[in-house]
Amino acid sequence: MMPKTEEPTYPLCPDETKYEKLAKIGQGTFGEVFKARDKKTKLVVAMKKVLMENEKEGFPITALREIKILQVLKNDNIVNLLEICRAKATPYNRFKSTVYLVFEFCEHDLAGLLSNPQVKFSLAEIKKVMQQLLNGLYYIHSNKILHRDMKAANILITKTGKLKLADFGLARAFSDKLNRYTNRVVTLWYRPPELLLGERNYGPAIDLWGAGCIMAEMWTRSPIMQGNTEQHQLTLISQLCGSITAEIWPGVEKLDLFTKIELPKGQKRKVKERLHGYVKDQYALDLLDKLLNLDPTKRVNSDDALNHDFFWVDPLPQDLNHMLSRHSKSMFEYLAPPRRRAPIHQQPQQPGVVRPAGHNPDQHFERIF
């Protein structure tokens, strides 16, 4: 891992004033994201501000990771980092240099599109979204990279319907050796059960769980498991996917938190039953069932998911450009009203705080890009 004090090698522009900021489209603990335009070329871009609050620590590790990984990943379904811009140190910024990551501009994120009831996805268009998402995952996993923050807000879509995986601040390289990665990754509502139970030797299956959550969201229009705490999230997972036991998931009893957390007992698996009210396609339900497998060793991988019958029977995947051409305004989660909670679960006995879908229970991971 590159030390924090080492600067990244990437095309640099000397001054961020070459861009005119047009609108703020994102906000989080990482800073702000702006839609901007190159004053000379008129190219529209997205500028992600990198917070440099503690310069003694050097370049922030999340931004450094994102830059390093995006230098390697070049694919139609991965957001393209164009350059890095520095703002000059002035009295206005307390003589602290501000850094911006400049990305290609995508008109929408998936969470923003799903927040708008006027945006209607046909089954064929949902297939196209998921096909592109899984193709992006297949590409990064083939290059030994884990995304580790799969969620609808991190799925960007251009006005012509091209899908881009974005926000690689939590991404990292992985190997097939025994590893000890942090399990404090992935936004809570999309976090797979193995991470919630303390697994540190994980792989691409964590991203496929997130893909399953996002796929279900294409019909429910809201995150399907909105836990308030890790315990609550495990309860919701058990209610949908069945009780977590060594019988259905061999080896789970070895995970650090398996005996320390009270897990619901006697829960039957109800993925197809609970989602059938939204998802009428039998092939879609079958793929969802495979993506939301509790056991990561049995969870379908991106290659097998792309070969699933869901994508190869009528209606075949259909480009999104015609549907999106009816919507002239950009749609981002940051700019959208809260989405309603998806009523696919019976709520647990303890009272829960009802949070809008735009709210992230893990503030550390709240990002748009």
Where are these regions (language model features)?
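C-terminal intrinsically disordered, low-complexity extensions immediately downstream
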Residues: 312, 316-369
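C-terminal lobe substrate-recognition/regulatory segment of protein kinase catalytic domains
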Residues: 243-289
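Activation segment signature within eukaryotic-like protein kinase domains
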Residues: 129-130
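Conserved N-lobe beta3->alphaC-helix segment of eukaryotic protein kinase catalytic domains
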Residues: 44, 48-74, 89-92
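Conserved N-lobe ATP-binding subsite of Hanks-type protein kinase domains
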Residues: 32
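Conserved HxN/HPN-centered segment at the entrance to the catalytic loop
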Residues: 75-85
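Catalytic-loop of the protein kinase fold
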Residues: 141-158
